[in-house]
Amino acid sequence: MGAAKKINYKKVLRDLVPINALSEAHIDEVTRKTTFEDLRSGRYVFRKGDRDYQSVYLLEGTIELIGAAREVVGTVKAGSEDALHPLAQKQPRQLSARASGKVTVARIDSRLLDVLLTWDESAGYDVVEIDAHDDDDWMTRMLQS
């Protein structure tokens, strides 16, 4: 596994699903904790059966998805609609992913993403306390009339 070049991928990450649903502060945190990796042609990004708890995104190049019989069952090209989503997300991995030429991938801890998404969702809820003994509520006024 090679070290990725030093490029700020924050703009690229903010377009990826589900990162695009995070708050700006959480996108910053994901960007800091993401591992960017360059791989040569023929190297595996992950293999069928792996349980790595990572969301892996293709940022540059083309990935071949390899099935159980070692046949290519699909390809994903950087910049495509499929590349906006994590590669073969289900754990354990149902497919292998192999670089078809030089590629750059982003590896993000799936558990971190889950926590940040939950925090952002719960931050969107407002809890309103209802006082059942409030004489000014509309139902009480209506019943008293």
Walk through the language-model features, giving the residues of each.
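Short proline/glycine- and basic residue-enriched helix-capping loop/turn segments at helix->loop/beta transitions
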Residues: 18-41, 92
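A small-molecule sensor/coupling module
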Residues: 9, 26-29, 87, 92-95, ...
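Hydrophobic residues at beta-strand termini and immediately following loops
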Residues: 37-39, 76, 108
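Residue-level signal for pocket-adjacent positions within structured domains
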Residues: 8, 14-17, 34, 40, ...
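Short, flexible segments with low predicted structural confidence
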Residues: 1-3, 27-28, 34, 69
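A short, N-terminal "cap"/entry segment at the start of jelly-roll beta-barrel domains
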Residues: 1-11, 15-25, 141-145
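Cyclic nucleotide-binding regulatory domains
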Residues: 18, 43-102, 113, 133, ...
